[in-house]
Amino acid sequence: MDQFLRKNPPTNELANNQQTLLEAETLLLIVDVQQKLISNIIDNQLLIFNIKKLIDTCNLLNVRIAISEQNPLKLGMTLESILEKNEYPKFEKMEFSCSENKNFLNYINKHNFKNIIVCGIESHICILQTSIDLLKKGLNILIPRDAIGSRNEIDNDTAFLRLILSGAVASTTESLICELCKTSN
């Protein structure tokens, strides 16, 4: 990956595409963390742990949270351990990209989000297609590397690289939590 980035450095235009994360302008989007999908995901317990940390932080700071579910009749609902009796806007979809779902697009337009933290599964399918579509709409997309996953490491790594080269902001769960909190108080 280092060799690739040396040959293909991000442009200044992409590097300047970063905004301060303000609570009212930021959405945490949890993509397809469903019963029948999660068991085959590499390091799935760490992924769930990190998503739950993001949820806890967003709940504490009143950052909105939304959930997508890919074909829930076939793949099951979002993991109960993710929801923990909380109710979040949920968008059921058959499309891989959340951006193809009119209800989701209406939701992000209604709240005028500028920043979307995208986490969940699978990196090379729904995370990738959703994020690229949202980037095309001018949104700032942040990808916590340790809160996305796929069944295969090569798919996960390649999707993450493609996302960054497409203009998404690379991050980690802890980094995003600290950026949202802005202080140790």
Which residues does each PLM region occupy?
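Short acidic, Gly/Ser-rich segments with clustered Asp/Glu that frequently serve as metal-coordination loops
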Residues: 35-40
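Bulky hydrophobic/aromatic packing residues
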Residues: 33, 53-57, 179-180
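A cross-domain feature marking catalytic cores of carbohydrate-active enzymes
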Residues: 33, 67-70, 145
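A short alpha/beta connector and helix-capping loop motif
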Residues: 24-26, 41-67, 72
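N-terminal nucleotide-binding beta1-loop-alpha1 segment
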Residues: 27-33
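Active-site-adjacent betaalpha module
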Residues: 2-27, 60-63, 73-185
